[in-house]
């Protein structure tokens, strides 16, 4: 399904009686083009015949962070307490948003639950999500709030040296907010959660939503939020430091990595994938494990 087809299907889901001309006006394209898109959607099985009877397709819900990322990388070695010539870029990020982005690129139907501020950054993120086909219609906008912003600096090799995050907006992703979207959550195929949201909200999801839950710890400071619910997770994706924290095992080599994995799997967590930065990732499960090399980042 193309991005345009996702957009048209979303409008049809919102208003099954909408006309082709109305769809054309909303999309800024010719009515004949809309007819072609609708024909394609019917062939793909998303629309069942005339009258825009929409089939309920499987979808994924992501609950977590959506940020404006500001990153700096020096041309050479990073020098502390000094101005470093280098490159600065702004991009859309957030662990949850990044996961949703990649799933949308894979053609999955993705619904996002998060909190936005009432600012231009939120508008920029919303526009990007619309282009990607990520549904943010159930998200919360906080009047007067500031959309989450993440500022980071890497060393000359691209590995993060330090970061500052302004993410107070996520305190609004409360259990009450999630309970108001329980139907959306319960009807999904799986749930992805990151630890940018409050610990009590993660606990509420683990206790009340009967879905496979995939969790990203985000950072060592936030990973502790997952400790009480480890046994209710389908899959956990920590980096080395987060895996050490949650497993209690110091990871220095492949053997200690496997020991950490065994400790986490013993909690009844169904799967585990440890990310080793530039080295790649190692996803052991109860059925065994293997290592995937990392794809170099391009600046």
Give each language-model segment a name.
Residues 56-57, 75-87, 105-189:
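Conserved N-terminal subdomain of the carbohydrate kinase-like
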Residues 61, 111, 192, 214-215, ...:
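Structural detector of well-ordered beta-strand residues that form the stable sheet scaffold
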Residues 93-111:
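Active-site alpha-helical elements of protease catalytic centers
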Residues 190-259, 280:
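Conserved beta-alpha-beta core of the PfkB/ribokinase-like small-molecule kinase fold
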């Amino acid at each position: 399904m193309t991005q345009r087809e996702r957009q048209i299907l979303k409008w049809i889901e919102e208003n099954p009686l909408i006309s082709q001309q109305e769809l054309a006006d909303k999309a800024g394209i010719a009515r004949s083009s809309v007819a072609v898109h609708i024909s394609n959607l019917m062939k793909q099985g998303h629309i069942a015949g005339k009258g825009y009877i929409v089939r309920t397709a499987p979808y994924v819900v992501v609950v977590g962070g959506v940020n404006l990322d500001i990153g700096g990388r020096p041309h050479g070695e990073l020098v502390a307490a000094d101005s470093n010539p280098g490159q600065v870029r702004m991009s859309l990020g957030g662990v949850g948003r990044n996961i949703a982005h990649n799933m949308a690129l894979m053609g999955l139907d993705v619904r996002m639950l998060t909190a936005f501020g009432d600012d231009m950054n939120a508008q920029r993120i919303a526009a990007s999500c619309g282009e990607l086909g990520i549904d943010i219609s159930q998200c919360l906008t906080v009047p007067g709030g500031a959309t989450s912003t993440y500022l980071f600096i890497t060393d000359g090799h691209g590995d993060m040296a330090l970061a500052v995050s302004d993410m107070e907006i996520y305190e609004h992703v409360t259990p009450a907010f999630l309970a108001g979207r329980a139907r959306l959550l319960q009807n999904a195929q799986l749930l992805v959660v990151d630890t940018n949201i409050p610990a009590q909200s993660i606990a509420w999801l683990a206790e009340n939503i009967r879905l496979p839950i995939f969790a990203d710890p985000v950072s060592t400071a936030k990973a502790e939020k997952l400790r009480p619910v480890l046994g209710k997770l389908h899959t956990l994706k920590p980096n080395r430091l987060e895996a050490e924290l949650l497993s209690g095992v110091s990871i220095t080599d492949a053997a200690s990595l496997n020991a950490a994995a065994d400790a986490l799997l013993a909690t009844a967590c169904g799967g585990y994938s440890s990310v080793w930065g530039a080295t790649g990732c190692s996803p052991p499960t109860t059925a065994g494990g293997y290592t995937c090399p990392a794809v170099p980042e391009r600046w």
